[in-house]
Amino acid sequence: MSEITAAMVKELREKTGAGMMDCKKALAETGGDMEAAIDWLRAKGIAKADKKSGRTAAEGLIGVSSQGTKAVVVEVNSETDFVARNDAFQDLVRGIAKVAVSTNGSVDAVAAATYPASGKSVSDTIKDAIATIGENMNLRRSVALSVEDGVVATYIHNAVSDGLGKLGVLVALKSTGDKEALNAIGRQVAMHIAATAPLAIRPEEVDAAVAERERNVFIEQSRASGKPDNIIEKMVDGRMRKFFEEVALLSQAFVINPDLTVAAAVKEAEKAVGAPIEVAGMARLLLGEGVEKEETDFAAEVAAAVKG
């Protein structure tokens, strides 16, 4: 078993909101495995699945761009928010997003593509910007969606400039109907995705490993009731149905009209569109998601702790 350090306990507390002794016990029970410790705490009812770390995420901007029946969302990181508010950096991210639409490819494809304003590759243009602005930056993610018929709607939450912000969403809608009406429902669905962060479009598309992990947690929680195995199985099945409803886009309650599911809202929109609509794809990029940088600002750390 790996040594349980104070740093590990601190990280688990930040991720779950559980008490120090509970975190220490969870790590000891799971051999120091952080993800297993989170599940252990959840099974005991001590932590919630969606508690997020309070550590500082990478700065930068999310950019979206669209062209005809395709669109892209990119993430470009910087070291500080100050640079993210710099006009030159914003122009760079906006330009990279436009290049990404034309390449319709991965980060590597976008990085190798020519940046029109410089005549150099996007990668070399970023290097030039680093030298000029004096801060490290990188193209971290690029996701493109396209349809043969229909639209790919885009949405930036709390935009800091045209097509730029901290959270960007794409949603691809297949339809031969009216494009203006299709864009209207597409934007609403994109706003919904920004708010709820669904894991998949349909329940059956939820990652099997994620579903299995949830089932195991529910089993452990249900066993604490002391009920027979056949009752526990029914309890777990019921909780799994609710889980799929909560994390799959089409079965979620529509944030704009909670009386409808997203599927029902899209179906209702078909009247204005004049043709069937299929939700064919989605992408949601939150700035700095999954990336943490070293904390060196003691004052900021204290302020974050005070805010809870």
From Swiss-Prot:
The keyword Thylakoid does not apply. Residues 80-83 are annotated as: Involved in Mg(2+) ion dislocation from EF-Tu. SUPFAM superfamilies: Elongation factor Ts (EF-Ts), dimerisation domain, UBA-like. Signal peptide: none annotated. CDD domains: UBA_EF-Ts. It holds the Pfam family EF_TS. InterPro entries: EF-Ts_dimer_sf, Transl_elong_EFTs/EF1B, Transl_elong_EFTs/EF1B_dimer, Transl_elong_Ts_CS, UBA-like_sf. GO terms for molecular function: translation elongation factor activity. Keywords: Cytoplasm, Elongation factor, Protein biosynthesis. Transmembrane segments: none annotated. It is found in: Cytoplasm. One of its GO terms (cellular component) is cytoplasm. Associates with the EF-Tu.GDP complex and induces the exchange of GDP to GTP. It remains bound to the aminoacyl-tRNA.EF-Tu.GTP complex up to the GTP hydrolysis stage on the ribosome. Belongs to the EF-Ts family. This is Elongation factor Ts. It comes from Rhizobium leguminosarum bv. trifolii (strain WSM2304).
